[in-house]
UniProtKB/Swiss-Prot annotation:
Nucleotidase that shows phosphatase activity on nucleoside 5'-monophosphates. The lineage of its organism: Bacteria, Pseudomonadati, Chlamydiota, Chlamydiia, Chlamydiales. Coiled coil: none annotated. It comes from Chlamydia pneumoniae. It catalyses: a ribonucleoside 5'-phosphate + H2O = a ribonucleoside + phosphate. This is 5'-nucleotidase SurE.
């Protein structure tokens, strides 16, 4: 495994808002891992489901924020998660020369096709657009299931892995932590391709006033084929799922199945056998 030879400059963002518990959990884990200096540019209010939406022809206010944990600098942004990353990389922290963007920790999973809607993942994709490696972190079900004691070493190992450039182009990682049954520990990590399942939502009718109809979106089920995808199966089997977020579009894909399987083998050989993770799983 490639080891870091410098202290990183890390920008954090999310889609649950700067005051969210998931952000606090992430900051705590990174402070304990002690791998870099932390800068925050996060929405001042919840921005879930914004994907890569940006505020065009709209004024976006960024306000200094006194974050309650010891970070280098923090800003609350009146915009989307993607707005936060654009401002962070191009304006607020431009002089810092950031090495990494981490988005999360989202309250609820972002796996399979639902990842397309995620503001958490949208922020990570924006970092890739700007040429910066990124990670999107999500906790299945609720942030209260996040295993804080194991997080520092897991995040450190994943950051080292990501910065070793294991893919043929600039790549992010979509990382989802399972809800462990009965409070048991996570059993391991797997590198998996993104799944095809779709957690669909149905517009719920709330009523009408003066001919105006009001609806709210609610997740009402999941479409699963005959066999669960590797990504979904990974979560169901109490393993942390790690799937790539590629920075390039291609009509034929960036990797063959055989090439991806080789990358999976290297993930197991390098990351899961490292001193950082053998004492966890």
């Amino acid at each position: 495994m490639v080891l870091m030879n410098k202290r990183l400059k890390i920008i954090l963002t999310n889609d649950d808002g700067i005051t969210a518990k998931g952000m606090s959990c992430l900051v705590s884990a990174l402070l304990e891992a002690n791998i870099g200096d932390i800068y925050i540019a996060a929405p001042q209010a919840e921005q879930s489901g914004k994907s890569m939406a940006i505020s065009l022809n709209q004024v976006v206010c960024a306000s200094p924020y006194a974050y309650p944990q010891p970070v280098k600098e923090a800003w609350a942004v009146g915009g989307s998660p993607t707005d936060c990353v654009r401002l962070g990389l191009r304006t607020l922290f431009e002089s810092v020369s950031p090495d990494l963007v981490i988005s999360g920790i989202n309250c609820g999973n972002n796996i399979c096709k639902n990842a397309w809607y995620s503001g958490t993942i949208g922020a990570a994709k924006q970092a890739l657009v700007d040429g910066i490696p990124s990670m999107a972190l999500s906790q299945d079900n609720h942030i209260s299931f996040f295993q804080q004691d194991k997080a520092p070493e897991i995040l450190k190992a994943l950051v080292i892995y990501l910065l070793s450039q294991p893919f043929p182009c600039l790549t992010g990682l979509n990382i989802n932590f399972p809800t462990s049954p009965g409070g048991s520990s996570w059993e391991g990590m797997r590198l998996v391709p993104p799944g095809d399942e779709f957690f669909y939502e149905e517009p719920q009718y709330l009523g009408s006033v003066n001919k105006n109809q009001y609806y709210v979106g609610k997740i009402s089920g999941v479409r699963i084929g005959e066999h669960p995808s590797e990504e979904l199966a990974c979560m169901l089997e109490n393993h942390i799922s790690v799937s790539p977020i590629f920075s390039q579009n291609s009509p034929i894909g960036l990797m063959t199945l055989e090439e991806f399987q080789k990358t999976q083998e290297n993930f197991n050989a390098s990351l899961l056998s490292s001193e950082l993770t053998t004492k966890i799983f």
